[in-house]
Amino acid sequence: MQTPLRVVFAGTPAFAAGHLTELLASEHEVIAVYTQPDRPAGRGKLLTASPVKAVAQERAIPVFQPLSLRSPEEEAALQALKPDVMVVVAYGLLLPKSILDVPAFGCINVHASLLPRWRGAAPIHRAIEAGDRETGVTIMRMDEGLDTGAMLKIAKTPITVSHTTGTLTNELETLGAQTLISTLDALPALLDQAADQPEAGITYAHKISKAEALIDWSQSTANITQKIRALNPAPGCFTVLGGQRIKLWEAITVSYGAVTTSAPGTIISLNKEGLIVSTGDGLISITRLQLPNKKPLSIAEIVNGNPDPLSPGNQFGSHL
């Protein structure tokens, strides 16, 4: 490794905090942390520090929480730190050119996809939702575009049918942190070898909206199971029965192209193995759900309790 770098770290959620923790265990020096301002959180809506700020405070690292980086004052504050590089992981603020140009080696970003596929805010969700078989992390030198910078390093990992956004995020956090450190260890050489992103294969991972969480039972079994996994743990998919919302947390495919005469959304059967529901092209087995005002339960637990709302013949709605 070359001489340890003076690093400014910019990030906000737990995913970024994992990267910061790994960076603090490396030979590189974290001289300051940038993160989003404290936000109201929890039932009491108390101002709460971001996970990244919490890690920084534990290590007595200076924390900056600007509302914007577009002022001359913010540029001057960053210049005063004399950083070699700025590492950005799910920060949440746009970096103008005046900021990108301050560090000696520029700003690098850890993005949770194999660019140029899934540029944007929700790459992990969208990869699962689309049925991708593979994803990973891309380390890029940032420019003024949306995840358009030259690529320094890529690390890949498979997506299985058991992955949710929650579990895959945890795996990519570990992979991303390891890849970040190895990138910083060889940064000058990697910058010289940086590769432009290909023009082919560009897709955008738009932010998840709450409206997307409502299951459309006319969709294919594959699309529905992928969506349930993609929106777990947040915001969580739901369906409607008797005017009430039922959250769907886990589901598996019963069969592709299974023949059924029941309308999409119809409950076919219920036993301890699963709740069988018709879809646009077959059947799906819901194995974990959450009834109104209840905690999430396995279907076996529901069968042992009060399964009345889930009687065969009832039909889930696709509209509020």
List each model region and its residues.
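Internal alpha/beta domain cores that form substrate/cofactor-binding pockets in large enzymes
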Residues: 6-8, 29-33, 62-81, 86, ...
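Structural motif corresponding to alpha-helix initiation and N-cap regions
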Residues: 17, 46-49, 71-75, 93, ...
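Donor/substrate-binding cores of folate-linked one-carbon enzymes
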Residues: 26, 36, 85-204, 209-211
